[in-house]
C-alpha cells in the first residue's frame, strides 16, 4: 500500500527513490519485446539470457580493458549478440516447439557453464566488477529505448514481415506452399530478438557494479517467457505489461517476505484460467472473462441490392 501512496502522492520523490526499479522495468520490457518477436513468428526460443550475457560481458570488458566510449561498447556488444544469434539460429531453427526450447536452453547453459565460468577474463565463477557503472544515469536512455523499440516492432508486425510471421505461426506448411521463405523469416525474427536481448544486457550491465553469470541462466529464460504469457503475445504491449507486473510484484508486496512467490504463482494461474490470451489481447486491454464464458456473436450487416 505504501508503494502506491508514494507513487500518487509524490511522483517526483517516487522517481528519485525508485530509480533502479524503473530501470529494471525498462530492461525487462526490452527483454519481453525480444521474446515477443520469436513467439510472434511461431518460435518457442528461450535463448534470450544467452544473448543478454553476450551484451553485458562484451560491453563491460571493452570498457575495462580498452576504455572505449560507452556508445561504442553497446553497439559492438549488440552486433556481436546478433552475429551469435545468426550462427546459433542456423542449426536450431530447424527444430520446432519444445525441441527448439530445449536446444536454446542448451545454448544458454553451454555459454554460461562452458564459457563464462571457465574464462579468466570473465571472472570465471566469481563474476566481473564494473567500477564505471552508473545506476542512476541510465533511466532516460532505457525508457526512451523501450518506447522506440516497442513502436518499431509494432510497425514491423503491421507490414509484410509481420504478415509473414503471422502466417508461419499459424501454419508453417501452408506458408511454404504460399511461397513464403519460412527459414529466412524465422531467422530474421531470431536475430532481431538476439539484438534486443543483447541491447538489454548491455544496458543492464552498466547499471550494476557487478556482473554475475547467475543473472543469465535458465531461470531467467522462464522469467522472460512469463512476461509474454502473462501479458499476452497478440500485441507488442502485452509482454511489456507482463514484464511491468512481474517486476513490480516484489515491491508492492515486499512486506510479506517469501509469500511473494505464492502470490505471484496464484496471480499467474488466475490469468491463465480467466484470460488465457494474456492481460493484453490482440486489440489491447480487455475485460477479464473466463475462457468458457459465452461471448456475444457478431451480427453481420444485412446485404442490400
Describe each region flagged by the PLM:
Residues 1-305:
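Transmembrane alpha-helices and adjacent helix-loop boundaries
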